[in-house]
């Protein structure tokens, strides 16, 4: 009876807690939906503008003019069409192959918005001057009459799990937005005083902006970007490029 009396309060406690446990377990699966900035209407697609940058043989790729295009050309278009562009991102690459040195702007929108953006870019005086100066070799546009990538995951890497393909566009949109805002934050501080005029001055100006962005990335990227992303994933290590675990 002594043992029974010792366990009796615990038994009452467990009985009292059972209703609470049952309530905690009542997860309504249909109510759990992915978070998105807005309900994406049908009839949209991913579109690309590929800036094929000049890259002479036996030279290092020139990256800083991407910042000029992004800041002075793409950023105003994003602001003007912000209600019709649901997602967007940048991609930069330099490889000695058919595509070569390329700066690509992806955006998810209706075809009419893509058509308007393409027309605006084709008549943009900055791009015309940049091509005349030999900085850009060619600009390749998608065909807005044909939606080849209608799904949100159609511009993601097909080697990834489908769950990542569907959610990654929101992640890279945020990363691209921060990069562009960082470029603008740095550039706008100096543009107020003595803005560059000639292509040579523009080249020098955005080279300096690029160097500052690179310094910020190298000195603060581990904590500001990688560490806090690692924190979201519970500080779990990941398999790095060298096929070993690393955390931030």
PLM region descriptions:
Residues 1-19:
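Sec-dependent bacterial lipoprotein signal peptides
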């Amino acid at each position: 009876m002594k043992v029974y009396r010792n366990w009796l309060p615990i038994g009452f406690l467990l009985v009292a807690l059972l209703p609470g446990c049952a309530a905690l377990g009542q997860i309504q699966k249909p109510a759990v939906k992915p978070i998105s900035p807005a309900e994406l209407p049908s009839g949209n697609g991913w579109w690309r503008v590929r800036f094929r940058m000049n890259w002479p043989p036996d030279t290092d790729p020139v990256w800083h003019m991407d910042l000029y295009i992004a800041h002075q050309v793409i950023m105003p278009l994003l602001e003007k069409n912000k209600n019709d562009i649901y997602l967007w991102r940048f991609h930069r690459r330099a490889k000695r192959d058919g595509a070569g040195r390329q700066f690509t702007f992806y955006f998810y929108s209706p075809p009419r918005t893509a058509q308007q953006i393409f027309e605006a870019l084709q008549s943009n005086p900055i791009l015309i001057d940049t091509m005349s100066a030999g900085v850009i070799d060619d600009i390749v546009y998608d065909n807005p009459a044909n939606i080849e990538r209608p799904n949100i995951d159609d511009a993601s890497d097909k080697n990834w799990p489908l769950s990542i393909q569907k959610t990654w566009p929101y992640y890279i949109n945020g990363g691209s937005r921060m990069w562009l805002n960082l470029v603008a934050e740095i550039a706008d501080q100096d543009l107020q005083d003595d803005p560059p005029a000639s292509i040579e001055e523009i080249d020098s100006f955005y080279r300096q902006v690029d160097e500052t962005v690179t310094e910020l990335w190298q000195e603060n990227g581990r904590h500001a970007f990688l560490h806090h992303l690692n924190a979201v994933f519970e500080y779990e290590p990941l398999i790095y490029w060298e096929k070993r675990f690393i955390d931030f």
